[in-house]
């Protein structure tokens, strides 16, 4: 069975931030201040650590791609 983006991010140690999900943003955050934010209206996402751009792993990219698919972006 294929995992959802939320499940994939959880497996990578991210927590879903419900406060950000108001049909405008979706945020996943790690304890180390890494965050992945999807801005739904603008159809963009960002990955940062301590408010600075961050390199991502292949597994993070897979989770990001899955979230983009679920949002209908790709």
Positions of PLM-derived features:
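Amphipathic alpha-helical segments
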Residues: 2-17
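Short, well-structured alpha-helical interface segments that form or flank functional binding sites
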Residues: 4-7, 23, 63-66
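Acidic, low-complexity, intrinsically disordered interaction modules
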Residues: 18-61
